[in-house]
Every structure is written in structure tokens, then in C-alpha cells.
Amino acid sequence: MKQRLLFLGPPGAGKGTQAERLCAAHELMHLSTGDLLRTEVGAKTPLGQEAAAVMNRGELVSDELVLAIVENQLKNQNGGWLLDGFPRTLIQAKALEPLLEELKQPIEAVVLLELNDAVLIERLISRGRSDDNESVIRNRLEVYREKTAPLIDHYRQQGLLQTVEAHGSIESIAISIEKSLC
């Protein structure tokens, strides 16, 4: 099975759930950029302090800072990894690639979890988050598609993209992902 992976997909497609399962089953390091940021901030590392200052101003953490945090995690990593939540744009992907090349850890596969909007909206509303109403969700899906479409094309052109239909049980989706990575 391929060992250096990216997960892409719209909000509600099950990326986090499937990433956790795959990482546990194959001893991959799960690199969720949101979790990494929170860990760095909590540990009060220099990168974490820089990220905290930005987040406390209500701003988005820069691509450069996220890349530095990802690099920090990967430079001591000998085994496989799954990057979840980054890159989200083509610009981020093009910044990530030289770093991975330098570390001699190129991406081996990109898993795109796809699901129709009706199911995504239903899943997100059922989570019960206060900001998950239908109009907000539709807007998030539109932003996702706008930002991610060029990224999907980029990985498709590189021959890395594996598309998996994320409809069905957690187990059946996990099996489809596993098959796509062999």
C-alpha cells in the first residue's frame, strides 16, 4: 500500500474518520493541519507562538507558517504519513512539493472523497454545530469547490489522484480507499 498520502474532499465527506482508520490500520502518522496548529500553540513552541499571535488577531495562519509546522513533523518521520487539511489550494500544493522533494518524501497518492451535496448537507446538519445551517453549508461547499478544483486537476495530471465515492458505511468506504491505494 502507498505510504505518503493526501486526503481531499468537501466538508462532511468523512476525511477525518477515514484518515484515523487508515492511519491506525497501517501505522501512518496522521498530520491534520488543524491538530498540528493546536499542538504547536499548546506546546508554546516558537512556531506555535507565532501561530497563536496570528489566530488571536482573527487572521488565517500563513501558508509559510503551516509549511514550517508540516516540515517540522516530517523531517523526523521515517515511516508513512497522511496529510489531511493541507494543501487546500494549488498555491499551497506548489509550495509543499519542493519541501517534500527536499525531504525525499514525495506524495504517493491523493485520495479524493466525493459525495453528492444532498448527503453532505444532511451529514453536516446532523452534526448539530451551531454554524452548520443549510445556507452556510452551501457556501462552504462552493468555496471548497472554487479553491480545490485546480488542486484536483493538478494531482490528476500528475497521475496521483484516486477518487473514492464516500457514500455508504464507514467500513465500505474504508475498503474502497484501501483498494485505491494498492
Swiss-Prot record:
GO function term, MF aspect, one: adenylate kinase activity
UniProt catalytic activity: AMP + ATP = 2 ADP
Cellular compartment(s): Cytoplasm
CC annotations in GO: cytoplasm
Main location: cytoplasm
Disulfide bonds: none
Binding site for ATP: 12-17, 127, 168
EC numbers: 2.7.4.3
Any single biological process term in GO: AMP salvage
Residues reported in the UniProt entry to bind AMP: 33, 38, 59-61, 85-88, 92, 129, 140
Keywords: ATP-binding, Cytoplasm, Kinase, Nucleotide biosynthesis, Nucleotide-binding, Transferase
Pathway this chain belongs to: Purine metabolism; AMP biosynthesis via salvage pathway; AMP from ADP: step 1/1
Chain residue ranges for the region called NMP: 32-61
Superkingdom of origin organism: Bacteria
Span list, region LID: 126-132
Top EC group: transferase
Subunit structure: Monomer.
Function statement: Catalyzes the reversible transfer of the terminal phosphate group between ATP and AMP. Plays an important role in cellular energy homeostasis and in adenine nucleotide metabolism.
Domain-level remarks: Consists of three domains, a large central CORE domain and two small peripheral domains, NMPbind and LID, which undergo movements during catalysis. The LID domain closes over the site of phosphoryl transfer upon ATP binding. Assembling and dissambling the active center during each catalytic cycle provides an effective means to prevent ATP hydrolysis.
Family: Belongs to the adenylate kinase family.
Name of the protein this chain belongs to: Adenylate kinase
Provenance organism: Prochlorococcus marinus (strain MIT 9313)
